[in-house]
Amino acid sequence: MGMYYDFENADGFATGAIGQPGARTFYLQVRAEGRTVSIKCEKQQVAALAEYLRTMLEDMPDTGTEVDPVSSSLVNPVEQDFVLGSVGLGVDRPNMRMVIQLEEMILVDEDDDDIFDLLDDDDDEIDSTVVRVLVTPSQARAFCDTADLFLSAGRANCKWCGTPIDPSGHACPKFN
């Protein structure tokens, strides 16, 4: 059974990566009300979230409020609560907050024919964990800036084929 977290005022909304380039694990982290929720995600999900938040920020007034850098950084130890599935974004204009909803990805066994029975049975709902958090425009901006740092800290891309170059070398298909 999934959990539902509804945080009206986030103390921190962060992203980061653990591990070496090429083998990093990305996380989102929400800190509010004395609780920390760490969500494993893909690098592309962090990039897309930062991109959409930046687009939304264009329509929000700049409050000029500085955010403590700690609030946009992962707090260790990072203990994964769930794996990110879908993301929803919105704006709470009266309170000048951005609404971010992070939903757990439900993993199913594709080889199990019984999964179709489970999905058709109203008594056996599959509940995912959901985190709904409201962040200030300043917190969203800090998240985007932190995301940029981690996204650009990955492996360099080959100038001929565009694929990432591993520390051990690169067999470029354009030259093989």
Task: Give names to the regions the model predicted.
Residues 40, 90, 132-134:
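Generic structural detector for well-ordered beta-strands
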